[in-house]
């Protein structure tokens, strides 16, 4: 089943910023193995990105097969970059299984993804790899590592999730990520890609605007939050947080998500999406595994920042420099 989502007319934006060029874009949401697809856009020269939605299980090879199918479809449709969600490699039943299934960055699974990137000729955002770091022997804990591969399969950036999700939501059950995971020590400077400069984050990080502001002030044009939101927080907070991060940073926001039931103990909300710098959801996945596509218009982003120069109007003398730019 296919569904088209078209950017609505920005009547109020045109009134606010009469010189602002509003791109007329359409994007496509697809389930795996569609029979035929077409992208309707008046700006086909703009870079195309694909956002993949999956239901990971403890079966790593089956998960890879599912992700590879979506990545190959994204490449066939002309995407230059495909985003995979947090825990694209697996979602285990408990912390002990998580540690058992984890691998180092130089392990077999990441090698399969480097080969996939080379085969398809596109960049991959691997949104949350269960990484056995160099301190594995000492800590017996892993990192939730966002890995960015270029089209030649080389690792160009790694970001280890800095905010761990230790929460207890009524109706959703407790989560204590720190039982098996170490927090990352630092942020990663934005990385230049064919779609624009990308700032890396992971899931729960989106609740801390300082991180997003720091990445934006360091030059990010696209913020990405690969996630595995639950069934209670998802409907209440998912879209609201993503749109807020896009509006306050004037960045595109790309959020690949886990969806559906992973096993008897866990399910995820889904609703992967792309939000533009005005805060409009310009692409959204349908229910179940699949992908959605959106074009990134950096000229639109720059015009919006000129017409609404919020970063020039900040008052750090009053409230400090929240989200201090990265060195």
UniProtKB/Swiss-Prot annotation:
Record has Cell membrane as a keyword: no
EC number: 3.5.1.128
Domain CN hydrolase positions: 46-298
Annotated organelle transit peptide span: 1-13
Domain of life: Eukaryota
GO BP terms, alphabetized: amide catabolic process
Catalytic residues in the record: 86 (proton acceptor), 161 (proton donor), 203 (nucleophile)
Keywords, ordered alphabetically: Cytoplasm, Hydrolase, Mitochondrion, Transit peptide
Keyword Kinase in record: no
The reaction(s) this protein catalyses: N-(4-oxoglutaryl)-L-cysteinylglycine + H2O = L-cysteinylglycine + 2-oxoglutarate
Tissue: Detected in heart, brain, placenta, liver, skeletal muscle, kidney and pancreas.
Gene Ontology CC annotation, any one: nucleus
GO MF annotations in UniProt: deaminated glutathione amidase activity
Family under the similarity heading: Belongs to the carbon-nitrogen hydrolase superfamily. NIT1/NIT2 family.
Described purpose of this protein according to its UniProt entry: Catalyzes the hydrolysis of the amide bond in N-(4-oxoglutarate)-L-cysteinylglycine (deaminated glutathione), a metabolite repair reaction to dispose of the harmful deaminated glutathione. Plays a role in cell growth and apoptosis: loss of expression promotes cell growth, resistance to DNA damage stress and increased incidence to NMBA-induced tumors. Has tumor suppressor properties that enhances the apoptotic responsiveness in cancer cells; this effect is additive to the tumor suppressor activity of FHIT. It is also a negative regulator of primary T-cells.
Misc. comment: According to Rosetta Stone theory, the existence of a fusion protein in one genome predicts that the separate polypeptides expressed in other organisms function in the same cellular or biochemical pathway. In Drosophila melanogaster and Caenorhabditis elegans, NitFhit is a fusion protein composed of a C-terminal Fhit domain and a domain related to plant and bacterial nitrilase.
Protein name: Deaminated glutathione amidase
Native organism: Homo sapiens
């Amino acid at each position: 089943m296919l569904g088209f989502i078209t950017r609505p007319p920005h009547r109020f934006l045109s009134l606010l910023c009469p010189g602002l060029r509003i791109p007329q874009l359409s994007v496509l949401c697809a389930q795996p193995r569609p029979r035929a697809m077409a992208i309707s856009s008046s700006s086909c020269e703009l870079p195309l990105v694909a956002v993949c939605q999956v239901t990971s299980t403890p079966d790593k090879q089956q998960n890879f097969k599912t992700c590879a199918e979506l990545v190959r479809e994204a490449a066939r449709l002309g995407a230059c970059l495909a985003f995979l969600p947090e825990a694209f490699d697996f979602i285990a039943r408990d912390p002990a299984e998580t540690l058992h299934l984890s691998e180092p960055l130089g392990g077999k699974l990441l090698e399969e993804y480097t080969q996939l990137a080379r085969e398809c000729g596109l960049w991959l955002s691997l949104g949350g790899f269960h990484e056995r770091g160099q301190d594995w022997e000492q800590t017996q804990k892993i990192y939730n590592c966002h890995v960015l591969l270029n089209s030649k399969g080389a690792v160009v950036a790694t970001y280890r999730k800095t905010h761990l999700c230790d929460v207890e939501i009524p109706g959703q059950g407790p989560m204590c990520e720190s039982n098996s995971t170490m927090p990352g020590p630092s942020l990663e400077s934005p990385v230049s890609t064919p779609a624009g400069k990308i700032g890396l984050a992971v899931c729960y990080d989106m609740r801390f605007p300082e991180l997003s502001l720091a990445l934006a002030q360091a030059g990010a044009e696209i913020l990405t939050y690969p996630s595995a939101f639950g069934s209670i927080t998802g409907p209440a907070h998912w879209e609201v947080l993503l749109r807020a991060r896009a509006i306050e940073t004037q960045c595109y926001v790309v959020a690949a998500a886990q969806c559906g039931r992973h096993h008897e103990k866990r399910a995820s909300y889904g609703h992967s999406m792309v939000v533009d710098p005005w805060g409009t959801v310009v692409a959204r996945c349908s229910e179940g595994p699949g992908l959605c596509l959106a074009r990134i218009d950096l000229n639109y982003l720059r015009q919006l920042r000129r017409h609404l120069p919020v970063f020039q109007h900040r008052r750090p003398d009053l409230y400090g420099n929240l989200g201090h730019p990265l060195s």
